[in-house]
A protein has these predicted regions:
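Acidic, glycine/proline-rich low-complexity segments that act as flexible tails and inter-domain linkers
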Residues: 1-87, 98, 102, 257-263, ...
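A glycine-rich phosphate/pyrophosphate-binding beta-strand-loop-alpha-helix module
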Residues: 41, 89-145
């Protein structure tokens, strides 16, 4: 099937969902050769991926991932595609802890660093979280603490078949955006940051196709795959199949914009310290604003409250230290 798909794509033809699913199934099953995978990914990148193709690929990735049963009615993932080359601290990781402290259920899916010095897994590991915790431990953490971490390497073992071709062709591929769409918990709420504004509306539709009920796809207009504390952010918010694209300006909510340099992180150890200093209230600069914006948006989604209320709740959590307590409980639970 993959050879037929390559032949169609090089002619500029799109794949229907059935063919796209069949090709991804071949890749994830180890049936496709590395040459075929490299050719397919290159041709697809040149043609450009459609909503149906991305949806089908993500569905098959989910089928091949390890089992995880959330045990809660609604759970959110707060995640970015990466690829913005900004080198920020782990904004979504800290925001996830704040969201959990505010009552949201957060199934955080992530990996080690790809385009930066420190990925979610690296930061959590440096904080003392057991990132390779047993599935049952993670299920209990989500249910009892409101947060868990699902290590991509642990759940997506079939990705070993695409590692070498991706490294060798050295171009962006559809897998750059598939990771955030393939959460093993199949989170039905999502705050997804993307590295390119052209992905905002299409990926909102993909998430809806995948069964995500409510969420936001965001792109900072400074290039960040987060809600930006530096400038405005383009957002596509969706709710049960209804889509609304708008621009969020932090100054309209009383925030002072910061310089991009304020958001820069470093090594896993440095980012872990930044996380603790934000959660304990020691950091009050643009890093804090970035967390309030992103955690507040997540709480808007999970708690069905306004953005203003979400931002206020996130600020209260940072002020009262409950986010730090959530981290401490999370560390203890994963190492029990």
């Amino acid at each position: 099937m993959i050879t037929e798909a390559i032949a169609k794509i090089v002619k500029g033809e799109n794949l229907d969902k059935e063919m796209a699913a069949a090709v991804m199934d071949e890749i994830m099953s180890g049936e496709a050769t590395q040459a075929q995978i490299g050719s397919f990914l290159t041709a697809l990148h040149i043609k450009g991926e459609t909503i149906d193709e991305i949806t089908a690929f993500a569905e098959i990735m989910r089928k091949h991932c390890g089992e995880f049963t959330p045990g809660v009615d609604e759970e959110i993932d707060i995640v970015g595609t990466g690829g913005d080359c900004a080198g920020t601290f782990n904004i979504s990781t800290v925001s996830s802890l704040v969201t959990a402290a505010g009552g949201g259920k957060v199934a955080k899916h992530g990996n080690r660093a790809a385009s930066s010095k420190c990925g979610t897994a690296d930061c959590l590991e440096a904080l003392g979280v057991n990132i390779a915790a047993d599935c049952k431990v993670s299920e209990a953490c989500l249910k009892d603490l409101g947060t868990c971490f699902l290590f991509a390497q642990k759940y997506h073992t079939a990705m070993r078949f695409v590692g070498a071709p991706r490294k060798e062709i050295k171009i962006p591929t559809v897998f750059n955006i598939l990771g955030p769409l393939a959460n093993p918990a199949k989170a039905n709420l999502q705050l997804l940051g993307v590295y390119d504004a052209s992905l905002v509306d299409p990926l909102a539709k993909v998430l809806s196709n995948l069964g995500v009920k409510r969420g936001m796809v965001v792109h900072g207009n400074d290039g960040l795959d987060e809600i930006s504390a530096v400038t405005t952010t383009t957002i596509c918010e969706f709710n049960d199949g209804t889509f609304n694209t708008y621009t969020l300006d932090p100054t309209a909510y009383g925030f002072t914009l910061c310089d991009k340099a304020e958001l820069v992180g470093g090594t896993p150890e440095e980012n872990a310290q930044i996380a603790k200093d934000i959660l304990s209230g020691k950091i009050t600069d643009g890093k804090r604003t970035a967390v309030i914006l992103n955690a507040g948006a997540a709480l808007h989604i999970t708690n069905r409250i306004s953005l203003e209320e979400g931002f206020a709740l996130a600020a209260d959590i940072l002020a009262n230290g409950s986010g730090l307590k959530k981290l401490e409980d999370f560390i203890a639970a994963t190492n029990a």
